[in-house]
């Protein structure tokens, strides 16, 4: 099979490498770039654990071919922490005990990040539930995840 020359920016770093045309974006990120924060749960795009941002939009990396990301910008959960400081969403997830095993957490965080970055978006408990409705957690139920989401947006909106 012929390799495809992939050029992609991942977490601010440009990578140019050959990939098999059938290689999934999740596998490229985890195995080729060693970014293991992106988790693969269902391998069908249903659970949301593999969510990353592709040109600022959440996508299920287990259903996207790496070649589809050519000349694009990708953000993974590893991009959230800056200079040793957790992103406000990560702080709220920790503060509100919104994780147990942590397998799904990166997917929730990357689903919420574009909403958090849009200062025109505010979330209450109802809209937070809707925002995360495409992500599945098998451990916590969802109350703590909703509380963490509302807390992060409240802190952002009130400069806490």
UniProtKB/Swiss-Prot annotation:
Pfam families in the cross-refs: Fer2, Fer2_2
EC number(s) reported in the record: 1.5.99.14
Cofactor: [2Fe-2S] cluster
Biological pathway: Alkaloid degradation; nicotine degradation
SUPFAM superfamilies in the record: 2Fe-2S ferredoxin-like, CO dehydrogenase ISP C-domain like
InterPro entries, per the entry: 2Fe-2S-bd, 2Fe-2S-bd_dom_sf, 2Fe-2S_ferredoxin-like_sf, 2Fe-2S_ferredoxin-type, 2Fe2S_fd_BS, Beta-grasp_dom_sf, Diverse_Oxidoreductases
Binding positions for [2Fe-2S] cluster 2 per the UniProt entry: 101, 104, 137, 139
Binding site for [2Fe-2S] cluster 1: 42, 47, 50, 62
Record's cofactor remark: Binds 2 [2Fe-2S] clusters.
Domain 2Fe-2S ferredoxin-type: 4-80
Keywords annotated in UniProt: 2Fe-2S, Iron, Iron-sulfur, Metal-binding, Oxidoreductase, Plasmid
Subunit structure, as described in the record: Heterohexamer of 2 alpha (kdhA), 2 beta (kdhB) and 2 gamma (kdhC) subunit. Dimer of heterotrimers.
Free-text function comment from the UniProt entry: Molybdo-flavoprotein enzyme complex involved in nicotine degradation. The subunit gamma (large subunit) contains the substrate-binding sites, the subunit alpha (medium subunit) binds FAD and the subunit beta (small subunit) has a 2Fe-2S ferredoxin-type domain which binds 2 2Fe-2S clusters.
PANTHER family named in the record: OXIDOREDUCTASE WITH IRON-SULFUR SUBUNIT
Protein name: 6-hydroxypseudooxynicotine dehydrogenase complex subunit beta
Lineage: Bacteria, Bacillati, Actinomycetota, Actinomycetes, Micrococcales
